């Protein structure tokens, strides 16, 4: 499928965005742009600045990389707008109405709110343009930890204990007894461990809620789960097959300043190591892969997801699902599939073709 003069499929790589994961999105986009097969795909870069302006994107993937702990950002350039008219689907126009480019498929490499949460998926659904990855429902539910866990629990999947704070800052005594200490206080709709605190004494709880509320008015408080951190990727092929990657075991995640896997630990400090495949027994590996696929289906995901677990003495417990996981050079999702025999370039090809197949 292509309408381009080159005969190639035109992929609009949309990245950046208004979320606190803006820079991670930029690095993911740079890696994707560098690995899309140039024999099959023409890349149309579209950036979204931190204040929400849609602009002509960076054409050089090398400029969207992490250099000396400096994360890239979308620069202010000439603005463009996506068409919402199905008769002009895939078109991006300059402010004067002239055409910037026409895409056959959208690859929304957006992490966090205003991108991974169903908003952009809904925007492009208005014009009937195919989009890589899950649709509106799965994206929205996957971003909101409250509803992720409600859907997983409804399917009988193993989850931890949590309490939601909407318009209050305190826990009741019953809730404190339910959760115990330590607890993790998180923005309910966030990622990359931004705004998260590990609380070991209740007198520190209000400060942690304030930090989380700086990123989301809704806060989730979770019991600490003691166990190994394991991740598993899920990939859907154009023919509908859903497969799980080999899992990855993360080590060193407690090295962050707060005693957990925080933003700097994930992307900057280079202290976390991953064993891929995870050194787990066959039964546990198969259970994690099965639970990952069940989680994918519970949220009605399409295309891809990364599912995060704690493996405890009593078995795996689901932590969260990422409907647009990181694609940076150090991200677990592409690394797990590479170890499963699906190279980065092939992984991207499957994802784009799956989106196009859904459209057909």
UniProtKB/Swiss-Prot annotation:
<keyword id="KW-0133">Cell shape</keyword>
<dbReference type="Pfam" id="PF01820">
    <property type="entry name" value="Dala_Dala_lig_N"/>
</dbReference>
<feature type="binding site">
    <location>
        <position position="320"/>
    </location>
    <ligand>
        <name>Mg(2+) 2</name>
    </ligand>
</feature>
<keyword id="KW-0573">Peptidoglycan synthesis</keyword>
<feature type="domain" description="ATP-grasp">
    <location>
        <begin position="149"/>
        <end position="353"/>
    </location>
</feature>
<protein>
    <recommendedName>
        <fullName>D-alanine--D-alanine ligase</fullName>
        <ecNumber>6.3.2.4</ecNumber>
    </recommendedName>
</protein>
<feature type="binding site">
    <location>
        <position position="322"/>
    </location>
    <ligand>
        <name>Mg(2+) 2</name>
    </ligand>
</feature>
<dbReference type="Pfam" id="PF07478">
    <property type="entry name" value="Dala_Dala_lig_C"/>
</dbReference>
<keyword id="KW-0961">Cell wall biogenesis/degradation</keyword>
<keyword id="KW-0460">Magnesium</keyword>
<keyword id="KW-0963">Cytoplasm</keyword>
<dbReference type="InterPro" id="IPR011761">
    <property type="entry name" value="ATP-grasp"/>
</dbReference>
<dbReference type="InterPro" id="IPR016185">
    <property type="entry name" value="PreATP-grasp_dom_sf"/>
</dbReference>
<dbReference type="GO" id="GO:0005524">
    <property type="term" value="F:ATP binding"/>
</dbReference>
<feature type="binding site">
    <location>
        <begin position="176"/>
        <end position="231"/>
    </location>
    <ligand>
        <name>ATP</name>
    </ligand>
</feature>
<dbReference type="GO" id="GO:0071555">
    <property type="term" value="P:cell wall organization"/>
</dbReference>
<feature type="binding site">
    <location>
        <position position="308"/>
    </location>
    <ligand>
        <name>Mg(2+) 1</name>
    </ligand>
</feature>
<comment type="similarity">
    <text>Belongs to the D-alanine--D-alanine ligase family.</text>
</comment>
<comment type="pathway">
    <text>Cell wall biogenesis; peptidoglycan biosynthesis.</text>
</comment>
<dbReference type="GO" id="GO:0005829">
    <property type="term" value="C:cytosol"/>
</dbReference>
<dbReference type="InterPro" id="IPR005905">
    <property type="entry name" value="D_ala_D_ala"/>
</dbReference>
<dbReference type="InterPro" id="IPR013815">
    <property type="entry name" value="ATP_grasp_subdomain_1"/>
</dbReference>
<dbReference type="InterPro" id="IPR011127">
    <property type="entry name" value="Dala_Dala_lig_N"/>
</dbReference>
<keyword id="KW-0067">ATP-binding</keyword>
<dbReference type="GO" id="GO:0008360">
    <property type="term" value="P:regulation of cell shape"/>
</dbReference>
<comment type="function">
    <text>Cell wall formation.</text>
</comment>
<feature type="binding site">
    <location>
        <position position="320"/>
    </location>
    <ligand>
        <name>Mg(2+) 1</name>
    </ligand>
</feature>
<dbReference type="InterPro" id="IPR000291">
    <property type="entry name" value="D-Ala_lig_Van_CS"/>
</dbReference>
<keyword id="KW-0464">Manganese</keyword>
<dbReference type="GO" id="GO:0008716">
    <property type="term" value="F:D-alanine-D-alanine ligase activity"/>
</dbReference>
<dbReference type="GO" id="GO:0046872">
    <property type="term" value="F:metal ion binding"/>
</dbReference>
<dbReference type="GO" id="GO:0009252">
    <property type="term" value="P:peptidoglycan biosynthetic process"/>
</dbReference>
<dbReference type="InterPro" id="IPR011095">
    <property type="entry name" value="Dala_Dala_lig_C"/>
</dbReference>
<keyword id="KW-0479">Metal-binding</keyword>
<keyword id="KW-0547">Nucleotide-binding</keyword>
<keyword id="KW-0436">Ligase</keyword>
């Amino acid at each position: 499928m292509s309408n381009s003069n080159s005969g190639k499929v035109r992929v609009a790589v949309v990245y950046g965005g208004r979320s606190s994961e803006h820079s991670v999105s930029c690095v993911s986009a740079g890696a994707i742009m560098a690995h899309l097969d140039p024999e099959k795909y023409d890349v149309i870069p579209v950036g979204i600045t931190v204040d929400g302006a849609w602009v002509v994107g960076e054409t050089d993937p090398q400029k969207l990389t992490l250099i000396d702990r400096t994360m890239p950002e979308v620069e202010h350039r000439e603005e463009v707008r996506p068409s919402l008219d199905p008769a002009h689907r895939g078109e991006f126009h300059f402010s004067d109405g002239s055409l910037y480019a026409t895409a056959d498929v959208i690859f929304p490499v957006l992490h966090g709110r205003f991108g991974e949460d169903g908003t952009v998926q809904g925007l492009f659904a208005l014009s009937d343009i195919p989009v890589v990855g899950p649709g509106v429902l799965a994206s929205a539910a996957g971003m909101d930890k409250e509803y992720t866990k409600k859907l997983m629990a409804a399917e009988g999947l193993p989850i931890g204990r949590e309490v939601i704070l909407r318009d209050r800052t305190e826990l009741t005594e019953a809730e404190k007894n339910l959760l115990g200490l330590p607890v993790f206080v998180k923005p309910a709709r966030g990622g990359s461990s931004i705004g998260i605190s590990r609380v070991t004494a209740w007198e520190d709880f209000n400060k942690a809620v304030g930090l989380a509320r700086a990123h989301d008015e809704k806060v989730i408080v979770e019991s600490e789960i003691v166990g190994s951190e394991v991740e598993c990727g899920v990939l859907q092929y154009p023919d509908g097959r859903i497969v799980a990657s080999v899992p990855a075991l993360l080590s060193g995640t407690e090295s962050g300043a707060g005693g957990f896997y925080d933003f700097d630990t994930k992307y900057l400090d280079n202290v976390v190591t991953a064993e891929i495949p995870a050194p787990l027994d066959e039964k546990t590996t198969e259970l994690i892969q099965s639970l990952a696929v069940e989680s994918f289906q519970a949220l009605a995901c399409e295309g891809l997801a990364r599912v995060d677990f704690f493996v405890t003495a009593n078995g795996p417990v689901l932590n969260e699902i990422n409907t647009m996981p990181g694609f940076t050079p150090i991200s677990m999702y592409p690394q797990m599939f590479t170890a499963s025999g699906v190279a980065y370039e092939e992984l991207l090809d499957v994802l784009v073709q799956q989106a196009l197949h859904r459209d057909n």
